[in-house]
Curated annotation (Swiss-Prot):
Keywords linked to the UniProt accession: Amino-acid biosynthesis, Cytoplasm, Histidine biosynthesis, Isomerase
Active site as annotated: D8, D129
Protein family according to the UniProt entry: Belongs to the HisA/HisF family.
Organism (species): Oceanobacillus iheyensis (strain DSM 14371 / CIP 107618 / JCM 11309 / KCTC 3954 / HTE831)
Pathways involved: Amino-acid biosynthesis; L-histidine biosynthesis; L-histidine from 5-phospho-alpha-D-ribose 1-diphosphate: step 4/9
Subcellular location: Cytoplasm
Gene3D superfamilies: Aldolase class I (3.20.20.70)
Protein name: 1-(5-phosphoribosyl)-5-[(5-phosphoribosylamino)methylideneamino] imidazole-4-carboxamide isomerase
One Pfam family it belongs to: His_biosynth
Source taxon at top rank: Bacteria
CDD domains: HisA (cd04732)
Single GO cellular component term: cytoplasm
PANTHER family named in the record: 1-(5-PHOSPHORIBOSYL)-5-[(5-PHOSPHORIBOSYLAMINO)METHYLIDENEAMINO] IMIDAZOLE-4-CARBOXAMIDE ISOMERASE
């Protein structure tokens, strides 16, 4: 299972939000590039980055910073947040980003999603941000009437290979992932599943590993020190 340290960027800084609430922000670093280098130095094999400004506005506000992050690292990065055009996908791919994550656009524009998957294949992932079983959009600020599980099955049928599944009510709450929901997602698809939201302890990480998930994104727990990246990565190496 790949561990993805999370770098969420807002106003050019590395931050974390509680349950996606833009009014509950903690700034962890003024330099996302330096933060990314720290995670790479600690042994990270893949990085997860989000343009929070972009997720809310639909514009790729922090694209230059994310390009700098991609070019500063020797490990792959995946990027999400406000990516709603083929032009922006192409900019990220050209900048060295390994995987581009579509969120709102994947829900609201099926033609765009299909074209993106046909054009970029496994370089496209889709973010499923769920609240009580329904998908939220626009940086989690809007609830949709789209049910998560049927939509996940639909994604697989059009050729999506990787999804990021986030339980919004768990995100940043340090209360553990929603294992029951993740199990339901896993039963519904053979796509690569990256779990996100609520990973708080090494025990959470171990439980996710037993589910044979493709990956887990960890944010607040790494920044607050309740999980040490090197410790869980050493556990990964021992298990291999």
């Amino acid at each position: 299972m790949i561990i993805f340290p999370a770098i969420d960027i807002r106003n050019g800084k590395c931050v974390r939000l509680r349950q996606g609430d833009y009014n509950q922000e903690t700034i962890y670093s003024n330099s996302p590039v330096e933060m990314a280098k720290e995670w790479e130095a600690s042994g990270a094999e893949y990085l997860h980055t989000v343009d929070l400004d972009g997720a809310k506005s639909g514009e790729s506000n922090n694209i230059n910073i994310i390009q700098d992050v991609a070019q500063a690292l020797s490990i792959p990065i995946q990027v999400g947040g406000g990516i709603r055009s083929l032009e922006v996908i192409d900019k990220y791919i050209q900048a060295g980003v390994s995987r581009v994550i579509l969120g709102t656009a994947a829900i609201t524009d099926s033609v765009f999603l299909q074209t993106a998957v046909e054009s970029y294949a496994e370089k496209i992932a889709v973010s499923i941000d769920a609240r009580n079983g329904f998908i939220a959009t626009d940086g989690w600020t809007k609830n949709s009437t789209v049910e998560a599980i049927p939509f996940i099955k639909q994604l697989e049928s059009i050729g999506v290979k990787t999804i990021i599944y986030t339980d919004i009510l768990k995100d940043g709450m340090m209360s553990g992932p929603n294992f029951q929901e993740l199990d339901a997602v896993q039963q519904a698809t053979t796509m690569n599943i990256i779990a996100s939201g609520g990973v708080t302890t090494e025990k959470d990480v171990q439980q996710l590993k037993t589910m044979n998930l493709y990956g887990a994104i960890i944010g607040k727990a790494l920044y607050d020190g309740s999980i040490k990246l090197q410790d869980i990565l050493e556990g990964e190496m021992d298990a291999r």
